[in-house]
Amino acid sequence: MRRLSSWRKMATAEKQKHDGRVKIGHYILGDTLGVGTFGKVKVGKHELTGHKVAVKILNRQKIRSLDVVGKIRREIQNLKLFRHPHIIKLYQVISTPSDIFMVMEYVSGGELFDYICKNGRLDEKESRRLFQQILSGVDYCHRHMVVHRDLKPENVLLDAHMNAKIADFGLSNMMSDGEFLRTSCGSPNYAAPEVISGRLYAGPEVDIWSSGVILYALLCGTLPFDDDHVPTLFKKICDGIFYTPQYLNPSVISLLKHMLQVDPMKRAAIKDIREHEWFKQDLPKYLFPEDPSYSSTMIDDEALKEVCEKFECSEEEVLSCLYNRNHQDPLAVAYHLIIDNRRIMNEAKDFYLATSPPDSFLDDHHLTRPHPERVPFLVAETPRARHTLDELNPQKSKHQGVRKAKWHLGIRSQSRPNDIMAEVCRAIKQLDYEWKVVNPYYLRVRRKNPVTSTFSKMSLQLYQVDSRTYLLDFRSIDDEITEAKSGTATPQRSGSISNYRSCQRSDSDAEAQGKPSDVSLTSSVTSLDSSPVDVAPRPGSHTIEFFEMCANLIKILAQ
C-alpha cells in the first residue's frame, strides 16, 4: 500500500548539534539570511545531498500571540503544492515544541531591494521582464485564492540568472468570495491606502498596488511614496500623487497611474495589466498559459487521488466541493492546483521548475528525475506528471543502482518511539476504540460496528526503519494466528500511557517480533480473545472497515 508520510502532528524533530552547528531534521543550519516578523531565515544544507535550502524559523509563541495557528495549517498544505517558476517553493514543514521550520527553496542572488540599492534603476526592458515574472506569480496565487499582502522588493529574490522569485507568504491568507480582510499588515511604503487607513479590503487589489510600487522602483530606483515622517508618508499614499520622471515611457506611466489608483474599485486588475500595451511587449508565453476550464462533470482521477492522499480525506469530500462549485474550499483549491501545475508543464515548453539554478528546461529527463531535495523523508512532494506503467511498477527500476521504493500501509515519523505510541493511545481513546497492549510497541485494536454489532480489528506495530526513523504499521489481523504467536494479554482500556517508558528497539528487535513483509488483509471476524465468533462471511466489508479504522486514526493523528 502507499506509504502515508504527512503525519504532521507526529512529524516533530528535535534540534541536534552537528559539528557545533544546529541540525534540524536532515538539514544542518548555517548563517542567517535575514530576520522577519516571526523569526529568522537561515541557510540549510542537506546532510545527504549537500543541496542548500532556506529554512524559515517561525516562533510558536509569536504565532500564538497573533492568533494565526489554526489559519496557517491548511494554507501551508496548499503552499506545498505551489509550483511556479517565480514563487519560492516550500519543500517541507518540520515542527518542534518551540518553533516551526519551513524548508524552502534557496536562491543565491539576494533581494531585489539590495540589487536596486547597489545598481540603481534598471532599464525599461529589464524592468518589464522582471515585472512580468512578478505579476505572473501574483496571478498564480490569486487564481488559487491566496493573497500575499506584503509584496515589496525585499520579498522578491533573484536567482543566479536574474529571475524573480516571490518569497515570504507569512502574512498571506486564503481569500473567499464576500470575505473582507481587516488585518492591517505589510510595509507602509508599499501598503495601499485602504490598508493604512484601516478600511475593509478584499485582498487582490492590495497586491496590485504593491506591485505598482515595485514596478516604479524598478524603473526609477526610488519609491513613489516616501517620507521619514510616517503621518506625511500616509498622507502621500492616500492622496495618490507621485512624481513621474521625464525619461519614463508615457505608456508605462499610464500603467503606473492605473495600478496606483487610490480608489480600489478603479484600480487596475490583473486582466487590465495583462492587456496593457506596455506589459504585452516581449511577454513569454509560459507566464500566462491559457486559463483552465474546470469542469464539474469531468473529474481527473489522478488529481483526485493526490488530494485525498495529501489531505488525508475521502474522495466524497473532494467531489462534494467540486460538484457544489465550492472553489474556495482548500480541497478544491488543491485539486485545481494539481491540474494547473500539470497543464503548465504540458503546454509551456520553456517552462522550467523553480529550482536553483533554473537552467533545466522541461524534457523527458527532467520530468522523471526527482528533485535533489525530494528524499524519502520529506513531507512535501511535488505534483508529478503522468508516468509510464514501468515507472509506476515498484518491481522495476528505470536506473540501475537506485534503491527500489518500499511501500507500506502506515506512517513514518522521526519522533521518539515512546512519544509515538503515547500519541497513538490518545488517538485511539478519542475514537472510542478498544485496545490491548501486547508489548509497548505492539497494540491490538478493535471497533464495534453499531449496525451489525460485529468487531473490526487491526494491529499497530512500530518498526525501526533506520537510526532515526520509525514506521507505524497498520495490519488487519486474525486472532487465532496472533494469539498463538503472542499469547494472551490483559486488555487495557484505560487512557493511561504510563507503560510507555524508555524501551528503544533495534532492527533486530523488530525482526524478533515477526516483522511482516506485506500488509495482511483478512475477511474473518473474530472476538478479541482467542475464540472465533460465528458470523456469516462479509466479502469485502471487513477490508473496507479496516481501512475506515486506519483513516479515522490517521485523521486524529494529523490534527
From Swiss-Prot:
The source's superkingdom equals: Eukaryota
Q: Which GO terms describe its cellular component?
A: apical plasma membrane; axon; chromatin; ciliary basal body; cytoplasm; cytosol; dendrite; neuronal cell body
Q: Where is the composition biased (Polar residues)?
A: 485-505
Q: What is the lineage of its organism?
A: Eukaryota, Metazoa, Chordata, Craniata, Vertebrata
What this chain does, per the entry, is described as: Catalytic subunit of AMP-activated protein kinase (AMPK), an energy sensor protein kinase that plays a key role in regulating cellular energy metabolism. In response to reduction of intracellular ATP levels, AMPK activates energy-producing pathways and inhibits energy-consuming processes: inhibits protein, carbohydrate and lipid biosynthesis, as well as cell growth and proliferation. AMPK acts via direct phosphorylation of metabolic enzymes, and by longer-term effects via phosphorylation of transcription regulators.
| Residues that bind ATP | L33, G34, V35, G36, T37, F38, G39, K40, V41, K56
Activity control note = Activated by phosphorylation on Thr-183. Binding of AMP to non-catalytic gamma subunit (PRKAG1, PRKAG2 or PRKAG3) results in allosteric activation, inducing phosphorylation on Thr-183. AMP-binding to gamma subunit also sustains activity by preventing dephosphorylation of Thr-183. ADP also stimulates Thr-183 phosphorylation, without stimulating already phosphorylated AMPK. ATP promotes dephosphorylation of Thr-183, rendering the enzyme inactive. Under physiological conditions AMPK mainly exists in its inactive form in complex with ATP, which is much more abundant than AMP.
Composition bias, kind Low complexity: at what positions?
A: 516-535
- Protein name in UniProt: 5'-AMP-activated protein kinase catalytic subunit alpha-1
Which transformation does this protein catalyse, written as a reaction? L-seryl-[protein] + ATP = O-phospho-L-seryl-[protein] + ADP + H(+); L-threonyl-[protein] + ATP = O-phospho-L-threonyl-[protein] + ADP + H(+); L-seryl-[acetyl-CoA carboxylase] + ATP = O-phospho-L-seryl-[acetyl-CoA carboxylase] + ADP + H(+); L-seryl-[3-hydroxy-3-methylglutaryl-coenzyme A reductase] + ATP = O-phospho-L-seryl-[3-hydroxy-3-methylglutaryl-coenzyme A reductase] + ADP + H(+)
Record: active site: D150
Modified positions (Phosphothreonine) are T32, T183, T355, T368, T382, T488, T490
> What keywords were assigned to this record?
ATP-binding, Autophagy, Biological rhythms, Cholesterol biosynthesis, Cholesterol metabolism, Chromatin regulator, Cytoplasm, Fatty acid biosynthesis, Fatty acid metabolism, Glycoprotein, Kinase, Lipid biosynthesis, Lipid metabolism, Magnesium, Metal-binding, Nucleotide-binding, Nucleus, Phosphoprotein, Serine/threonine-protein kinase, Steroid biosynthesis, Steroid metabolism, Sterol biosynthesis, Sterol metabolism, Transcription, Transcription regulation, Transferase, Ubl conjugation, Wnt signaling pathway
Cofactors (names): Mg(2+)
* Free-text domain note: The AIS (autoinhibitory sequence) region shows some sequence similarity with the ubiquitin-associated domains and represses kinase activity.
Q: Which is one Pfam family of this protein? A: AdenylateSensor
Provide the positions where the record notes the PTM Phosphoserine: S356, S360, S397, S467, S486, S496, S508, S524, S527
